[in-house]
Amino acid sequence: MRILFFLVAVLFFLFQAAPAYSQEDADTLACRQSHGSCSFVACRAPSVDIGTCRGGKLKCCKWAPSS
């Protein structure tokens, strides 16, 4: 029975820490809201660079059809 209480306490502690890691940077949210995707490398055609992600560490790319 003690193990059950210990397990519940540990799980409660772990789930308390989770929301801090789920908060995204504002630029990442803006990229996703404009239907872009984050990329480690430069955007490849037909995608265009529309901003940054992860606090400026990544590129935000959006597919742009060629006309």
UniProtKB/Swiss-Prot annotation:
GO terms for biological process: cell chemotaxis; defense response to bacterium; defense response to fungus; defense response to Gram-negative bacterium; killing of cells of another organism. Changing residue 2 to G: In strain: Xinghua. It is found in: Secreted; Cytoplasmic granule. Disulfide bonds join 31-60, 38-53, 43-61. The keyword Lyase does not apply. GO terms for molecular function: CCR6 chemokine receptor binding; chemoattractant activity. Coiled coil: none annotated. Pfam families: Defensin_beta. Keywords: Antibiotic, Antimicrobial, Defensin, Disulfide bond, Fungicide, Secreted, Signal. One of its GO terms (cellular component) is cytoplasm. Strong expression in the testis, liver, gall bladder, kidney, esophagus and crop. Also expressed in the glandular stomach, ovary and male and female reproductive tracts. Low expression in the intestinal tract. Expressed in the ovarian stroma, but not in the ovarian follicles. Its main location: secreted. SUPFAM superfamilies: Defensin-like. Gene3D superfamilies: Antimicrobial Peptide, Beta-defensin 2, Chain A. InterPro entries: Defensin_beta-like. Residues 20-25 form a propeptide. The keyword Signal applies. Residues 1-19 form the signal peptide. Has bactericidal activity. Potent activity against C.jejuni, C.perfringens, S.aureus, C.albicans and S.cerevisiae. Less potent against S.typhimurium and E.coli. Belongs to the beta-defensin family. This is Gallinacin-9. It comes from Gallus gallus.
